[in-house]
UniProtKB/Swiss-Prot annotation:
Residues 1-25 are annotated as: Disordered. Binds to the N-terminal domain of the chaperone ClpA. One of its GO terms (biological process) is proteolysis. It comes from the Bacteria. It comes from Phenylobacterium zucineum (strain HLK1). This is ATP-dependent Clp protease adapter protein ClpS. HAMAP family: ClpS. PANTHER family: ATP-DEPENDENT CLP PROTEASE ADAPTER PROTEIN CLPS, ATP-DEPENDENT CLP PROTEASE ADAPTER PROTEIN CLPS1, CHLOROPLASTIC. Belongs to the ClpS family.
Length: 109
């Protein structure tokens, strides 16, 4: 009689057990989009930017604008990297086209 090897079903066919593992997905890193105060950009333009690119109501946009004006910096929103990067580019581009020195940056949340 021949020896049976582990996993040998006896008919010369080997069997194996395959376990399926679920991939672990991580939440993407989030980034804060920040507006920086300057002495030249009109407050109304800052409110416009907040309404246009961050979907803020007039009231919320005004509140954020005043916070930026009083504290030097304010958070416009928190987004994934790609979205935050796009919003920063949109704000900076629009400010330049309107000849305003408004600065917009992003930092990891």
């Amino acid at each position: 009689m021949s020896e049976r090897k582990e996993g040998d079903s006896g008919a010369g066919v080997r069997s194996a057990v395959i376990t399926q593992t679920k991939p672990k997905t991580q939440k993407p890193a989030m980034y804060r989009v920040l507006l920086l105060n300057d002495d030249y950009t009109p407050m109304e333009f800052v409110v416009y930017v907040l309404e246009q690119f961050f979907n803020k109501s007039r009231e919320d946009a005004t509140r954020i604008m005043l916070h930026v004006h009083q504290h030097g910096v304010g958070v416009c929103g928190v987004y994934t990297y790609e979205v935050a990067e796009t919003k920063v580019a949109q704000v900076v581009d629009t400010a330049r086209r309107h000849q305003h020195p408004l600065q917009c940056t992003m930092e990891k949340d």
